[in-house]
């Protein structure tokens, strides 16, 4: 019995380690961009881990109305990073959490509706969305490689210094080397090993402060509305609703992938229960001032690698995350990681997000001219909106935030163009089916003559 318990714990810890780096990146990126205090950043990291655990349990424990019942793990969504920073910069941090609460309620209430719309999210759409998410995050990773543009709201005098660039490139190279020579589970730890080694090197260089660790309490009960009462603004809410739809699209692909790994065909009812669980997870994130959550693809890869597909492993992993979230000192360790080290690691991860999107696009019919037009226009408009934000300066603030985020602009373009061209395809197919009997009849008459 003890041997079995140890095996379950070890396999569960493996799942936690596989997603840990990705889970803590979002609070680090958002917290630093919004210039929160060290104490507030420690809270964001702790509550993020706790909410990841709760969200995982909600999704894994198959209920009558909630939870898809697959061994899936949830983490903070990368697609929410840029919109959260934009909302926080324009409306304040309170508007961020008001919009997240609204998005969670929206997804929960309309889960059944989304369950009937999965045909609108083929690989040409999901692949484009995931590719845009990666492309939108890469600039943040590169800026962190240079040391981060700002420190506590002030310009960083060491931005672009040789030390920062060498440190970040060293982390990047180490991760690549580990991926080349390590195998199995050890390879899945390459990002964490790179971050740990980079932080150790930065500490030797005098670039690391552990004051946040010493100041953080050993135990902390999560506080609803840690940053104060949420503010409900129409612009941020619309933006976060779109983020929620993009999260649904992304999670749908992961649900199907894990269902295939586990040999369990998914029904519309299963998807609806999965969407409800994600809606509740996002709502909890808003109430406790955390983040929107979605299903993590890296854990699907780990399931494929280990061949261990039992739900109790992931349930235990969710419990481990909850425990970690109740111990702020552990969370504070992550806040001590220098921006340059984080940048070296995130560039790899964000690049992998792009690669995942390209892989999804490769499963689409790229001989179809309409698919190529959908991909081309969506990515072009998405990148354009991100790189030339000034073009929307004259727009009202709510609309400006919505359209200036490249991921949202590109995702909406992909969804609408796919729908438009799908209707065109159906009309052409109907026309061909109508013309075919006429053609056959004509040929028959010619043959008789």
Swiss-Prot record:
Uptake of uric acid. Disulfide bonds: none annotated. It holds the Pfam family Xan_ur_permease. The chain crosses the membrane at residues 11-31, 41-61, 67-87, 91-111, 119-139, 158-178, 191-211, 229-249, 277-297, 313-333, 334-354, 372-392, 401-421. It is found in: Cell membrane. Induction: Expression is very low in excess nitrogen (glutamate plus ammonia) and is induced by TnrA during limiting-nitrogen conditions (glutamate). Expression is further induced when allantoin or uric acid are added during limiting-nitrogen conditions. GO terms for molecular function: xanthine transmembrane transporter activity. One of its GO terms (biological process) is xanthine transport. It is a multi-pass membrane protein. It comes from Bacillus subtilis (strain 168). Belongs to the nucleobase:cation symporter-2 (NCS2) (TC 2.A.40) family. This is Uric acid permease PucJ. The gene is pucJ. InterPro entries: NCS2, UacT-like, Xan_ur_permease. The keyword ATP-binding does not apply. Signal peptide: none annotated. PANTHER family: PURINE PERMEASE C1399.01C-RELATED, URIC ACID TRANSPORTER UACT. One of its GO terms (cellular component) is plasma membrane. Keywords: Cell membrane, Membrane, Transmembrane, Transmembrane helix, Transport.
């Amino acid at each position: 019995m003890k041997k079995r318990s140890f095996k379950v714990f070890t396999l569960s810890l493996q799942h936690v380690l596989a997603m840990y780096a990705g889970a803590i990146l979002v609070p680090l990126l958002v917290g630093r961009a919004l210039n929160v205090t060290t104490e507030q950043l420690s809270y964001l990291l702790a509550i993020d881990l706790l909410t990841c655990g709760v969200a995982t349990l909600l999704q894994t424990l198959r209920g009558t109305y909630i939870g898809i019942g697959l061994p899936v793990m949830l983490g903070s969504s990368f697609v929410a990073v840029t919109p959260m920073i934009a909302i926080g910069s324009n409306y304040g941090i309170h508007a961020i959490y008001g919009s997240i609460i609204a998005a969670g309620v929206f997804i929960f209430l309309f889960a059944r509706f989304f369950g009937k719309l999965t045909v609108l999210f083929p690989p040409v759409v999901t692949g484009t969305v995931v590719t845009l998410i990666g492309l939108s995050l890469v600039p943040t990773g590169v800026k962190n490689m240079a040391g981060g543009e700002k420190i506590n709201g002030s310009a960083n005098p060491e931005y672009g210094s040789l030390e920062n660039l060498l440190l970040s490139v060293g982390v990047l190279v180490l991760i690549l080397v580990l991926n080349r020579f390590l195998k199995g589970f050890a390879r899945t730890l390459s990002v964490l090993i790179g971050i740990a080694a980079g932080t150790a090197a930065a500490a030797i260089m005098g670039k690391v402060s552990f004051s946040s660790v010493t100041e953080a309490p050993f135990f902390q009960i999560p506080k609803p509305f840690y940053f104060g009462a949420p503010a409900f603004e129409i612009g941020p809410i619309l933006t976060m609703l779109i983020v929620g739809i993009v999260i649904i699209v992304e999670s749908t692909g992961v649900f199907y992938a894990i269902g295939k790994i586990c040999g369990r065909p998914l029904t519309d009812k299963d998807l609806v229960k999965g969407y409800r669980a994600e809606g509740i997870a996002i709502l909890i994130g808003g109430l406790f001032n955390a983040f929107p959550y979605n299903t993590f693809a890296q854990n699907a890869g780990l399931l494929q690698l280990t061949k261990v597909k039992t739900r109790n492993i992931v349930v235990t992993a969710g419990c481990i995350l909850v425990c970690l979230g109740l111990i702020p000192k552990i969370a504070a360790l992550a806040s001590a990681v220098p921006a340059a080290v984080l940048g070296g690691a995130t560039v790899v991860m964000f690049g992998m997000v792009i690669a995942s999107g390209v892989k999804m696009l490769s499963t689409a019919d790229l001989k179809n001219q309409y698919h190529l037009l959908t991909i081309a226009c969506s990515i072009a408009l998405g990148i354009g909106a991100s790189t030339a934000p000034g073009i929307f300066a004259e727009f009202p603030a709510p609309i400006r935030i919505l359209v200036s985020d490249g991921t949202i602009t590109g995702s909406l373009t992909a969804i609408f163009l796919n729908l438009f061209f799908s209707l065109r395809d159906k009309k052409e197919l109907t026309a061909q089916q109508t013309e075919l009997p006429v053609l056959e009849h004509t040929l028959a008459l010619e043959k008789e003559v």
